[in-house]
Regions:
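Extracellular Ig-like/FN3 beta-sandwich strand-entry sites
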Residues: 61-63
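Intrinsically disordered, low-complexity segments enriched in small/polar residues
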Residues: 1-59, 68-119
Length: 119
């Protein structure tokens, strides 16, 4: 036999991004669970119109949190009712809790975008 069957066990991940669809630049903080089950808050600065956060953390947890605010402080994306308070940008902020949509009970792995829009 020339070739031997090889089996690979690969792990699947979520990659989370926030896309800015607001005409003002924003700062974004995302709180994600790492593959070792610890949690980390990652901050992204000065995300311009139609740009997205870069270099997100790999996670195999379908729950994540995010907070965003315009640089001038006039608008923000946060949840004081169902959210969670965590440190971001040197202050305690209210983060949105989000969960990845499941299709027919199956987890949708890969890239997931949250849109920050303003009028």
């Amino acid at each position: 036999r020339l070739f031997q069957r090889v089996r690979f066990d690969t792990e699947q991940f979520h990659y989370f991004y926030v896309q800015n669809r607001c005409h003002k630049p924003i700062n974004v903080a995302m709180r994600l669970q790492l593959t070792d089950n610890s949690w980390r808050t990652q901050e992204f600065y000065d995300i311009g119109y139609n740009e997205r956060t870069e270099g997100t953390i790999e996670s195999n947890n379908s729950i994540y949190y995010y907070f965003a605010k315009t640089l001038d402080g006039s608008m923000g994306w946060f949840d004081e009712v169902n959210g969670k308070q965590k440190k971001a940008f040197g202050r305690t902020e209210w983060f949105f809790r989000k969960e990845i949509f499941r299709e027919n009970g199956q987890v949708l792995w890969g890239d997931h975008y949250t849109i920050a829009e303003c009028e």
